[in-house]
Swiss-Prot record:
The lineage of its organism: Eukaryota, Metazoa, Chordata, Craniata, Vertebrata. The modification Phosphoserine is found at residues 695, 729, 735, 983, 1015, 1044. InterPro entries: 6-hairpin_glycosidase_sf, 6hp_glycosidase-like_sf, GH15-like, KPBA/B_C, PHK_A/B_su. It comes from Mus musculus. Residues 1039-1055 have a biased composition (Low complexity). It is a lipid-anchor. This is Phosphorylase b kinase regulatory subunit alpha, liver isoform. Hexadecamer of 4 heterotetramers, each composed of alpha, beta, gamma, and delta subunits. Alpha (PHKA1 or PHKA2) and beta (PHKB) are regulatory subunits, gamma (PHKG1 or PHKG2) is the catalytic subunit, and delta is calmodulin.
């Protein structure tokens, strides 16, 4: 008989260790592992980690087999692994209804359970009796299901199980916006059942999604039906959130040792090696002790000061756990494995020796890993005084199966029985490797031959959509409908993937569906849902952003292929040429670089061999799921609205279409636009039916009379609901109400019925002859208010032509005419919502940016601190906007732009925790008033008239603090809007905008506009306006340097006019902007935490920030920063808020002094007021009393607001003097005397 090799003997020793410490807890029926002999429940996460040693040992036996018995032993061990994984699968499949609900609700009550009965696979506690929602546990199951399947194990047996796993992918793909209870099952560290977004959960979910994508769950025995599909945009969302969170673990935990599992084995979720090292160093420096690592700071679990009779902690109680947190040896096993994967022999040796020193010797000398080490109750005070000096005692489970398993696995790796690639067959360990540069392939396609010809006139040879046949081209939303079919299973009542927006990563792949190649255009070119895609400049800007995004985030083999359609909406107003912005973009694409991204422009056929393909085999003819099986239910977006249809040239004759063609045609036709309204007439001799002689307010006045309402209407940008009563006009800038100009009474000949009320039937008859956009809008608005959106007009004798459908058609016409204020208002009437609104909001929240909507103060200003379903989010925005439709729509728009910037330029949001959308909109209007030198109402109207591109540009200038210029220009001759169009431009170092520097383009445009104006009838100008005045409005009105806070003749926040010079107002403007966007100095919150430790609290605008906050929260917690923000945000004036922040910064200097205490509550307001008085005294002594106007709301001098922080007469100088005076008796006597 062959002698046993040394390696075989060692493996037998590990086999005995595994049997005696792990497998002895495995249930023979279900395969689940109980937590201990006393605790019979099986935790999902613990079971997976506990079986890893068995999996690793099985592979070690298979590789080092000396005898047939070794191969048999390997098979037995592997089947123990399969049995456990299938046991967990059975537990989850019994809760299939929860998986289905959770996909749509993401509610903690609809989540899979975190633990099950070991013997029966049934649940053990109620839905609301445990912190069940633990995304990392479900994700860990999928991650190792993928890894084990790739290693050769067969865990999934049937297609029903495949469908369930596909739905588990949908369950975890929204992890980046799901607040859960985390790997410690506690959520917020107060243990009060408050879920929070956990970096560990996001990281493991990202790893699982990447690992299982395109994996055949049947392994070598599978086929196309057993492949799992993952959308890459969901993975990238997780990556982005991880990058923004780390090294923080969550809102309440500034660091967590559990992050070791995502920066190294098993998840390897972080791609930035520097971020990996920073996170690891933070864990070691803040959490490591002599016996392992603490889970997180102020962790009270099993400490002597924890009350074992209650689950939750009181907030101030957390301070008691500082420096006595229990230390867990399991984290050293992570660090050993991390060292092995990184090839760091010193780290491996150091932690192996340290771990050997704290292992418990059990029966027969086997090594056991205890759960944790705790401070003896009688040594607590000694540990408080001298941390890490007291000898600890082991507590908890012995062995701790999770730690025991990783200890054995690390030993097998360290001793060479396993290679790193064997426990990571999917090569996740290379996540930090340098990626090659990405070249984005761009195919420009003309919608039809006419557009193709127009492009050729400019020297651009492109294909039309018909030319690329047999490649099919479809809008991106069709891909969302198709993916809604993925994962459907009638046997288990699984509906598949919820209808969701698919990002540019998803649409930049080529798809093979039923042996046909499909390419999908990106959804930012789709006008289906919201008006952003109606602005060609916005489309170009989004193309630039998405190309840069593709270059940064593309991870797949092959190149991304972006199909950019040039449609009829990208033509000039008269349809004779391509829009200049689109032409310029195509020329830049031809150069090979666009917005910093490397691109290759070409035909689709040229890209077929270099593109990345996804085979959507779940749509194959022999699959059980029928395309038309549920077409009226979940395959449609819940907020579908009519649009301009799909790419008609790509469709085939009806008789030649197969089922797939018919299905796509049905999707397109079901959302195509039907025309009922009479066509618009652009000729000058066509008169305005109403708008040429009557303003909107006149129509509303007549409506009020018809309704018997006594209302006074101020000049407005758009109509508002008459039934809402005495509502003020849209005015975002506080200013004194000007005297109303008397408007002559016109004799309106409204059609009336026998009861002398407005006859809506006759009004519909007048609509038939109305060919002016604004007139059609006026009539439809009256019908909307008086009859409601669902009223059937029977226009032209056609049944089912509701007011809603006519408004939808009008929306499309307004889009073609670029009437942005009208577009925004109709969007509000139709309750259109941005398809990506919920995702945009979740992106901001996931980047630790809370949102408020509506104008301050509370309760009008609503805070959004957790992701909300789209319908609930939209309703909250309308409620916070006071049902002001225009503001509600603009709020959605701003949220989308903020999300774009937080993804592309996160540095813009440095030191910002709460984005107050209402204040941002108000400041945008204020900035326009300053630059245009106009009144508040005019600025508000101008803001609503901005194109989406200009709105986004203005927002960027607000966020960045850069100067900008505003240019006026007349509208096209057929425009129904009387207010001049304006555009936002960047101001260069010369003080001129880019268009002014170029000059020629603008001059040509003005000459063309003047010629068109000269040939027009006078009726197209506002009443009483002369031709010379109209032409004069073309002149640019801009501010090349910062001027007064709201312009040389506009108003300040207190309603007073400021007559300052062009160079004044810079610092007031800066403070107003920083206060509106809640920007604070670097390290502000940590400094506030320190000063709170030396006083009883800070009083800000009547609200106290108590010192007890530091008992609960640590200085670097996001939770603490949010708490400070909540107090500061009670101040409604942004410039005053910023002065308070400056005063607090001066106060924080005291935290560095040797004083233990500064006394009671410090009143920050009094310090600011005292500083203002000192400033006024100096100004009076200089004889400048004529410009010392005060803010009526706060009493602060405008000149003080506008003073620079530094300098002899800067705000910091006076604030320092005020602090010294306010706290004089408490300051050290040896301190420097204030001058």
């Amino acid at each position: 008989m062959r002698s046993r090799s040394n390696s075989g003997v060692r493996l037998d020793g590990y086999a005995r260790l595994v049997q005696q410490t792990i497998l002895c807890y495995q249930n023979p029926v279900t395969g689940l592992l109980s937590a201990s002999h006393d605790q019979k429940d099986a935790w999902v996460r613990d079971n997976i980690y506990s079986i890893l040693a068995v999996w690793g040992l099985g592979m070690a036996y298979r590789k080092n087999a000396d005898r047939d018995e070794d191969k048999a032993k390997a098979y037995e061990l592997e089947q123990n692994v399969v049995k456990l994984m299938r046991g967990l699968l059975q537990c989850m499949m019994r809760q299939v209804d929860k998986v289905e609900k959770f996909k749509h609700t993401q509610s903690t009550k609809d989540s899979l359970h975190a633990k099950y009965n070991t013997a029966t696979c049934s649940t053990v506690v109620g839905d609301d009796q445990w912190g069940h929602l633990q995304v990392d546990a479900t994700s860990l199951f999928l991650l190792f299901l993928a890894q084990m399947t790739a290693s050769g194990l067969r865990i999934i047996f049937t297609l029903d199980e495949v469908a369930f796993i596909q739905n588990l992918v949908f369950y975890i793909e929204a992890a980046y916006k799901v607040a859960d209870y985390g790997m410690w099952e506690r959520g917020d560290k107060t243990n009060q059942g408050i879920p929070e977004l956990n970096a560990s959960s996001v990281g493991v979910a990202k790893a699982a999604l990447e690992a299982i994508d395109e994996l055949d769950l049947f392994g070598a025995h599978g086929g196309r039906k057993s492949v799992i599909h993952v959308l890459p945009d969901e993975v990238e969302h997780c990556q982005s959130i991880l990058f923004s969170m780390l090294p923080r673990a969550s809102t309440s935990k500034e660091i967590d040792a559990g992050l070791l599992s995502i920066i190294s084995f098993p998840a390897f979720a972080v791609e930035d090696v520097n971020l990996v090292n920073v996170t690891k160093n933070e864990i070691i420096s803040k959490l490591q002790g002599r016996y392992g690592c603490c889970r997180f700071l102020r962790d009270g679990y099993k400490t002597p000061r924890e009350d074992p009779h209650r689950l939750h902690y009181d907030p101030a109680e957390l301070k008691l756990f500082e420096n006595i947190e229990c230390e867990w040896p399991v984290f050293w096993t992570y660090l050993i494995i991390d060292g092995i994967f990184n090839g760091d022999a010193v780290q491996v040796q150091e932690y192996r020796e340290a771990l050997e020193g704290i292992l418990i010797r059990g029966k027969d000398g086997i090594h056991l890993v205890p759960e944790l080490y705790a401070i003896p109750p009688d040594k607590v005070d000694e540990e408080y005084k001298n941390p890490h000096t007291v000898d600890r005692v082991p507590l908890g489970k012995l062995p701790h199966l999770w730690g025991q398993s990783l200890y054995i696995l690390s030993s097998l790796l360290a001793e060479g029985f396993l290679a790193t690639g064997e426990i990571d067959p999917l090569n996740r360990r290379f996540s930090t490797s340098v990626k090659p540069d990405v070249v984005v392939q761009v195919a420009v396609l003309a919608e039809n031959s006419h557009i193709k010809g127009l492009l050729k006139e400019h020297g651009m040879t492109v294909q039309s959509i018909a030319d690329v046949h047999p490649i099919r081209v479809q809008p991106g939303r069709i891909l969302s409908h198709i993916y809604a079919k993925l994962g459907r299973n009638k046997n288990m009542k699984l509906s598949g993937r919820p209808y969701r927006h698919i990002g540019v990563l998803g649409t930049s792949k080529l798809y093979v569906i039923r042996n046909h190649i499909f390419t999908f255009t990106p959804q930012f070119t789709d006008q289906h849902h919201f008006y952003l895609a109606l602005d060609n400049e916005m489309i170009v800007e989004m193309l630039r952003i998405e190309l840069a995004y593709l270059c940064t985030c593309w991870r797949m083999t092959g190149r991304p292929t972006l199909t950019f359609p040039v449609t009829h909406t990208m033509l000039t107003n008269d349809g004779s040429d391509i829009h200049p912005a689109v032409l310029s973009t195509i020329r830049k694409l031809e150069d090979g670089y666009f917005g910093g991204a490397r691109v290759k422009l070409g035909n689709l056929a040229e890209f077929l061999t270099t593109s990345f393909y996804t085979h959507l085999t779940f749509l194959d003819p022999d699959c059980d799921e029928k395309l038309f099986g549920d077409i009226t239910d979940r395959s449609f977006s819940p907020d579908s609205e009519p649009d301009l249809g799909g790419y008609l040239e790509d469709s085939s004759p009806q008789e030649s279409q197969d089922e797939l063609d018919q299905y796509i045609s049905h999707l397109l036709q079901s959302t195509s636009l039907k025309c009922y309204l009479p066509p618009l007439c652009k000729k000058s001799e066509d008169s305005h039916f109403f708008s040429a002689i009557h303003s909107t307010r006149d129509i509303l006045s007549v409506m009020a009379k018809a309704k018997g309402l006594e209302t006074t209407f101020f000049p407005m940008i758009l109509p508002t609901k008459v039934l809402s009563g005495h509502r003020k006009s849209l005015n975002l800038v506080d200013s004194p109400q000007p005297l109303l100009k008397t408007t002559p009474e016109y004799d309106y000949q409204w059609p009336r019925d026998d009861h002398d009320e407005v006859d809506c039937e006759k009004l519909v008859g007048q609509l038939k002859d109305c060919s002016n956009l604004q007139d059609q809008a006026d009539i439809l608005y009256i019908l909307y208010v008086m009859k409601g959106p669902r009223w059937d007009t029977n226009l032209f004798g056609q049944h089912g032509v509701t007011v809603h459908s006519l408004l939808s058609e009008l929306y499309g016409k307004a889009g073609l005419n670029q009437e942005w204020s009208l577009i925004r208002y109709i969007s509000g009437l139709l309750r259109k919502k941005v398809e990506v609104l919920a995702e945009a909001c979740a992106d901001l929240l996931s980047h630790q940016k809370q949102l408020t909507v509506g104008l301050p103060p509370e309760p009008r200003e609503k805070t959004i601190s957790t992701p909300l379903p789209p319908e609930e989010l939209t309703e909250l925005i309308y409620e916070a906007s006071g049902q002001d439709i225009s503001i509600a729509v603009l709020t959605q728009e701003i949220v989308v732009y903020l999300a774009m910037y937080v993804r592309a330029q996160p540095s813009l949001f440095a030191e910002m925790l709460r984005l107050r959308i209402g204040l941002i909109i108000q400041v945008m209007a204020t900035e326009l008033a300053r630059s245009l030198n106009c009144s508040g109402k005019e600025a508000s109207e101008s803001l609503m008239n901005l194109s989406p591109f200009d709105m986004k540009s203005l927002l960027h200038h607000i966020l960045s603090g850069k100067e900008f210029g505003v240019e006026r220009s007349v509208r096209p001759i057929h425009s129904s809007m009387s207010s001049p169009a304006i555009s936002i431009h960047e101001v260069g170092h010369t003080g001129a905008t880019k268009t002014e520097r170029s000059g020629i383009t603008r001059l040509r445009s003005e000459m063309k506009q003047m010629n068109r104006r000269a040939s027009a009838d006078e009726q197209f100008f506002p009443l009483g306006q002369t031709m010379s005045n109209s032409l004069h409005s073309i002149k640019s009105v801009r501010s090349s340097t910062p001027s007064s806070p709201t312009g040389t003749s506009s108003t300040d926040s207190g309603g007073q006019h400021l007559g300052w010079g062009e160079q004044q107002g810079q610092w007031l403007r800066r403070r107003r902007l920083d206060g509106a966007i809640n920007r604070v100095p670097v390290g502000f919150y940590q400094k506030v935490w320190k000063i709170l430790q030396k006083c009883h609290g800070l009083s800000i605008d009547g609200y106290v920030l108590p010192s007890s906050t530091t008992q609960e929260m640590t200085p670097c917690e996001i939770k603490f920063a949010v708490h400070v923000e909540s107090v500061l945000n009670r101040v409604s004036q942004p410039e005053y808020r910023q002065l308070l922040v400056e005063a607090i910064m001066v106060l924080t200097l005291l935290s560095d002094t040797e004083m233990d205490s500064i006394g009671g509550i410090i009143h920050v307001d009094q310090i600011v007021q005292l500083a203002n008085q000192l400033f006024l005294q100096d100004q009076v002594s200089f004889g400048t009393t004529d410009i010392l106007e005060k803010d009526q709301a706060t009493g602060i001098c405008h000149l003080f607001y506008d003073s620079a922080p530094s300098g002899a007469y800067g705000t910091m100088t006076y604030l320092t003097k005020a602090v010294a005076s306010h706290l004089q008796e408490l300051l050290p006597s040896s301190g420097c005397q204030m001058q």
